[in-house]
Amino acid sequence: MDESRPLTVSEAFTLYEKDLVARGGNPYNAEHPRTHLPAVILNKPVSLLGATELRRWRDSLLAKGLAPGTVNRAKTGLRAALELAAAHDPRITNQRAWKVGLSALPDAHRARNVILDDATVRRIVRAAYDHDRALGLMIEVAAVTGARLSQLARLEVADLQADGPEPRLLMPLSAKGRARNKRHERRPVPITPALAAVLKQEAQGRAPDAPLLLRANGERWGHGRRRHHRNDFRAVIEAAALDPDVVTLSALRHSSIVRMLLVNTPIRIVSTLHDTSVKMIERTYSRHIAEHTDALARRALLDVSQRLADSNVVPMKA
């Protein structure tokens, strides 16, 4: 990259994608917004961008029929690329252009999470094992832990604690929104003894720093590379008599979160185990929290319609 001339938006995306890969992030965050940008913006120097044209681009995505949440994700990726470019090039001084032009759309967070009951999740896991053992194991770990594929891909053999009555995985934190030095941290996530036994057998003979979960060809699952599982997972969902356009791998994560909420697990514990925030849990799963809160509260309701004779109160004689 020629540093003697101003960076273009396209070059800013290239820089951002390399930075994401270096930090263990998802390069899709750079690829996705790039596909929605016209050549006139991609080829333009970052330093010449204006708020009006960026706002016009953002609003054009809505006109094309993209959901507000999708538009917000696209503009967030563009903003991140532009911020990184400005950090590398002191000649870029127009940060206000994207702070104003790429402001977030209001009320764009409308959760459309697919929640599956336990029987359906088990059916998916069985179908996955029937399709491909390596895929089945990855999907079972996803179903039990509720972790993202990006986290599962970074699990190492040493992260498995299979011995003892309370087996667990030391789950890598997501790189999402974290500083570079945070992505190597792990948090213990409980797993079932049966799953621990399978993982221990699969990991036998591998080095401690070797990937715990491998694809059928022996390679690591590539987070951010949907081709590694997309078509196979669609086939699994169809085999489980479900709609692959509705049920995605994320449904296992959403179902895990709701499963914990419905057995009265404190929200802070749920958020920690699923590597998210209390705020996000409350915002995304508010309906399920409200339903469960209602069920708990009803147990303590006083029914004043019961006959007085049914109580322990003895009326006084005249």
Model-identified regions with their sequence ranges:
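Basic/aromatic-enriched alpha-helical hairpins
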Residues: L7-G65, A81-E83, A235-E238
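Basic, Lys/Arg- and aromatic-enriched nucleic-acid-binding interface segment
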Residues: P68, N72-T76, A87, T93-L149, ...
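Conserved tyrosine-mediated DNA breakage-rejoining catalytic core shared by Y-recombinases
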Residues: K99, S103, T120-R123, R154-Q201
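Catalytic-site neighborhood detector that most strongly recognizes the C-terminal catalytic loop/helix
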Residues: I115, L173-G177, H274-R299
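DNA/chromatin major-groove-contacting recognition/catalytic segments
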Residues: A127, R187, R283-A318
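C-terminal catalytic core of tyrosine-transesterase DNA break-rejoin enzymes
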Residues: E140, V144-Q151, A251-S277, E291
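Short, polar N-cap/turn motifs at the start of nucleic acid-interacting alpha helices
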Residues: D159-E166, V246, T265-T284
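C-terminal catalytic core of Y-nucleophile DNA break-rejoin enzymes
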Residues: R178-K200, D209-A235
